[in-house]
Amino acid sequence: MSDNIFKRTKILATIGPATFSQEKVYQLLEAGVNGIRMNFSHGANEERIEQINWVRTASKQLGKPVAILQDLQGPKIRLGVLKDNMLNVKVGDMLVLDSEITDHDGSFNLPVQYNLAEKMKVDEPLYMFDGKIRTVVREIVSSTAIRVEVQNDGFLMSRKGLNLPDTDFGGDILTQKDINDLEWGASQDFDYVALSFIQKADDIIDLRRRLTDLGSTANIIAKIETKSAVDPENLEEIVKASDGIMVARGDLAVEAGAEIVPVVQRRIIALCRKYCKLVIVATQMMGSMVDNPEPSRAEVSDVANAVIQGADVVMLSDETANGKYPVETVRAMRKTIIYTQEHSEVMLVEKAEMREKTDAILSYTAAQLARRIKARAIIAGTRTGATAINVAAYRPNLPIVCVTEDVKTAQKLALRYASRPYVRPSESNAATKLADELKQEGYFGADPVTVVLVSGHNPEPGKTDNIQVKTLS
């Protein structure tokens, strides 16, 4: 079998200027990428249509389903354009941030792309340049402007992000741009939609209602990057309401403190596994490869740790969007994943109450049976993907070959742990036929080959009720 078949933790790569061609997209997928992230903070829809076509074309050429994720910008607040693109500041400086300013004159009256006066209160912290400059709100100057006091020396740059760790957005995390992007995205049939700066489960419920109204079946990924989202009780409700979680470690470190990120990451992965939710670990996983052809030892350890904790997906951002070595980065990440999964067991997690149901017990039984009889694979027949997802939640140490009649289901399963989706016509013996086909292609290696077949006769999603052990000849 090839490395790509064995890779149980999946790779999600961000497309950008460094990978803006059909050839580069093909190379990313060939190197081991299972899903493409489209960052809606940048770019135009005309470019995105081209990118989507590249992904779908390369997917067909390689014969592997690939997920596409629409990552909404959310209330990402940025400075406007500064004169000379930079401004030096020092402790004690008083800055005015005004959404009405369009042209910066070099003074401490700064343009900002959001009306902070509507949301912020006196004495709340405001972090500028992605956390490099710390300030505190001292005055609400007008209906469009606030005055902040600088807490450390440094400099600001045009269009850099602002973070408001203690500010309550009052449920307004979907901007008008996000709503417009959602409407356009529904016409493109994305597999996943990621929502930024989630603060509570109601944010997800609102997004799901909007997607339903638009006729979209995209799964919702909640990005955890705020202090309020990591409150233990709140976090669990967010996990339960979503289809998956992205541990957005960059903004989370700025908003809540870098020291909490490793523990929060571990907690989120455990919760997602407990509730059968997709979990993506993101941000600077191989950041040094933006400029260097090899990862650092710390980055390799970071990826390996996510694999050991049982993450479904590890994500690349700048590395593949803007880096000098996008394809090499994917190869390095894949190599790390494969070595780690072959030499270290995935950590165990608490089982959720929902797993006391019959279909969940059967999924657990299938995973344990496959392990004990040393099966080469679990073959999961699934219409909606639920059967394969239930099995994957137990993190079996072998491929889950998923056979489905639905292309959309196959694309979503492309990001699920250990899943290898195939699209086949709906037949009662589709799983058996696929197993025989793969055996003839040499997918399972040398004889004897034993597989575990898992399926359900009940038309309801996830109603697994059939397990078979089959020796392929």
Please tell me what each predicted stretch does:
Residues M1-S473:
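Non-catalytic helical/linker scaffolds that mediate oligomerization, partner binding
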